């Protein structure tokens, strides 16, 4: 993975540094478990690994990764940015308004309709982001540690 990440960083014009490689590998390692990472999430994971990468460096690297397209930034109804690896373009998000949990989903019909609507307005869809805000139908489905006060 490190060799692939080295090639990736070089291909987007970023210098290969240990913090960049470490943060990218960490996001890849935890992608299934945590699809959306805040800078603080990354920093906590780094601390668990006894890394000496500081929070300011984490913010800087995440912003650089976003600028070159490695990451996508989201602000799911909050001022706190979260990032996800830019590996799966065709998905959207449902955010629970009670607990803040984010679910990713794919729907070919929605993707098709977005392209059609763009074309109806004489445009070609380049990218999109769709956030659906909902409430968990079963409150026990909500993750209590994430509940909003």
Curated annotation (Swiss-Prot):
Chief location bin: cytoplasm
- Residues annotated as binding Zn(2+) are 36, 84, 93, 96, 99, 104
Sorted keywords for this record are:
Cytoplasm, DNA-binding, Iron, Metal-binding, Repressor, Transcription, Transcription regulation, Zinc
Q: Where is this region: Dimerization?
A: 88-149
The UniProt annotation puts the region (DNA-binding) at 1-87
GO cellular component, as recorded:
cytosol
Can you name one GO molecular function term for this protein?
DNA-binding transcription factor activity
Disulfides per UniProt: none
Binding of Fe cation: at which residues?
90, 92, 111, 128
What is the annotated localization of this protein? Cytoplasm
Classification via SUPFAM superfamilies: Winged helix' DNA-binding domain
Any one Gene Ontology BP term = negative regulation of siderophore biosynthetic process
Question: According to its UniProt entry, what is the function of this protein?
Answer: Acts as a global negative controlling element, employing Fe(2+) as a cofactor to bind the operator of the repressed genes.
Similarity annotation: Belongs to the Fur family.
Quaternary structure (record): Homodimer.
Protein name (database record): Ferric uptake regulation protein
Organism listed in the record: Haemophilus ducreyi (strain 35000HP / ATCC 700724)
């Amino acid at each position: 993975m490190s060799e692939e990440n080295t090639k990736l960083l070089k291909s987007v014009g970023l210098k290969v540094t240990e913090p960049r490689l470490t943060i990218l590998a960490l996001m890849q390692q935890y992608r299934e478990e945590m699809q959306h990472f805040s800078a603080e999430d990354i920093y906590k994971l780094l601390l668990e690994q006894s890394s000496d990468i500081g929070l300011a460096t984490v913010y800087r690297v995440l912003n650089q990764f976003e600028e070159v397209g490695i990451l996508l930034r989201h602000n799911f109804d909050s001022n706190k940015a979260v990032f996800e690896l830019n590996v799966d373009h065709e998905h959207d998000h449902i955010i629970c308004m009670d607990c803040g949990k984010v679910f990713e989903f794919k729907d070919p019909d929605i993707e098709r309709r977005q392209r059609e609507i763009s074309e109806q307005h004489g445009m070609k869809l380049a990218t999109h982001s769709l956030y659906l805000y909902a409430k968990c139908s079963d409150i026990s489905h909500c993750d209590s540690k994430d509940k909003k006060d």
